[in-house]
Amino acid sequence: MQLKRQDFIASMRSINPADIIVLDESGSDLTQTSDYARAEGGYRAKMPKPHNPGKKFSIIGAISIMCIVAVMYIDCAVNQDIFYTFIKKLLLKHLKPGQYLLMDNINFHKQEQIKKLVESVGAKVVFLPPYSPDLSPIEKMWSKVKEIIKRFQPRTEAEFHNALFKGLADVTAEDLEAWYEECGYEVAA
């Protein structure tokens, strides 16, 4: 596994980070609660958290070093058909010839129809080495967005929608560039 990581890192050094689009899925539900709270001196902060997770959401997103390229959320698990629809309807129009679509190794990412779709616009599919979320800048974005969702404590789909898009709006170009750099992509000064 270590050799695969080293090979991946070496191969990515020859690619301009501006040509790398990173895609990943994340999940959330309606029980998100902030990890931090304030209380008067001598009292413990109480943060009620629903016991029933209620509706669960899957979020699919793609980023570049400059911006969030595409995002979609649904109230079910992502499968091959949903993933294909995301690529075809939302992401494909943003991919350019010579770009690389970087994804993890989940089975439905590896479908031949996904590869053909991406290659139809002149882009290439690249997979992260196994167990390497630390090489994926979008993981850092999901972390920031989920912290913002927690602060809003959504309990309805409308509240979740607002919290998600507030979190996404708070992601800056500086964040994205820093996350690419933290993941080892050589960002020009």
Model regions and ranges:
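RNase H-like polynucleotidyl transferase catalytic core
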Residues: A45-N52, V121-P137
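Extended, low-complexity cationic-aromatic segments
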Residues: Q2-K88, G184-Y185
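Mobile genetic element proteins and their domesticated derivatives, centered on retroelements
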Residues: V22-D24, G61, I87, D104, ...
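Short, basic/hydrophobic alpha-helical segments
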Residues: I82-Y100
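Acidic/histidine-rich, metal-coordinating catalytic segments
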Residues: P97-K110, S136
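Short, solvent-exposed loop/turn segments at secondary-structure junctions
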Residues: S26-D29, S64-I68, N107-H109, S132-P133, ...
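Short beta-strand segments
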Residues: V22-L23, Q99-M103, F127-P129, Y180
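C-terminal anion-handling pockets and recognition modules
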Residues: P17-I20, I138-A189
